[in-house]
Design a protein with these regions (language model features):
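ABC-family P-loop ATPase nucleotide-binding domains
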Residues: 47-104, 108-111, 117-120, 128
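Conserved small/polar residues in nucleotide/adenosyl-binding loops
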Residues: 1-4
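Conserved H-loop
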Residues: 139-144
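ABC ATPase nucleotide-binding domain signature region
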Residues: 6, 12-15, 19-71, 145-146, ...
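Conserved D-loop/post-Walker B switch-helix segment of ABC ATPase nucleotide-binding domains
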Residues: 120-133, 149
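Conserved catalytic network of the ASCE P-loop NTPase/AAA+ motor domain
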Residues: 36-38, 105-108, 133-137, 151-152
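Short glycine/serine/proline-enriched coil/turn segments at secondary-structure junctions
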Residues: 81, 150-151
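Conserved phosphate-binding and hydrolysis motifs of nucleotide-dependent enzymes
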Residues: 11-16, 95, 116-117
Length: 161
């Protein structure tokens, strides 16, 4: 069982960390070799890029068919103020947008949670909150991240490319 297992991929810029994730997600990128995954494997993905986020959190939850109450409860655990729930996400900071994607991911039923640099734009306090959420939800995860403290706190096995 891979539940509660976390693998963190590290490596220098350009070593292929994000490309590896994209191959797993079946993105059409040039590669050699064969990539196979189990049939019916459901993956929840948090990309590096947050620039596409716009609209209210309520609209976002409806579009992505996630439980709005759970979504907002997770955001509250990451220090979102209730007043932010009605604001347009295009006005959110980069860190707030990253939290939206993390909360969305944790609301999605999946076999594997793939997060590409989830701590970009995240302050230390929020990092600790994210660590607590990972421990609470216990998802099987594949992450690209450079933060050694984070790796230790979520008890992730490290693979270096």
């Amino acid at each position: 069982c891979i539940r509660d297992r976390r693998i963190l991929i590290q490596g220098k810029n350009g070593s292929g960390k994000s490309s590896l994730l994209k191959l797993l997600l079946k993105y059409p990128i040039e590669h050699t070799g064969t990539v196979t995954s189990g049939s019916g494997l459901v993956i929840s993905y948090v990309p590096q890029d947050t620039s596409h986020l716009k609209g209210t959190l309520t609209e976002f939850a409806k579009v992505h068919k996630i439980d709005e109450s759970l979504f907002k409860a997770i955001l509250r655990k990451m220090d979102f103020e209730r007043v932010q729930f009605e604001k347009d996400m295009k006005d959110f900071s980069a860190g707030q947008k990253k939290k939206v994607l993390i909360a969305k991911s944790l609301c999605e039923p999946a076999h594997l949670y793939v997060w590409d640099e989830p701590l970009n734009y995240i302050d230390v306090y929020s990092r600790i909150q994210i660590e607590q959420l990972i421990r609470q939800f216990s998802p099987a995860m594949l992450l690209v991240e450079h933060d050694v403290t984070f790796q230790k706190e979520i008890d992730a096995k490290v693979i270096t490319l």
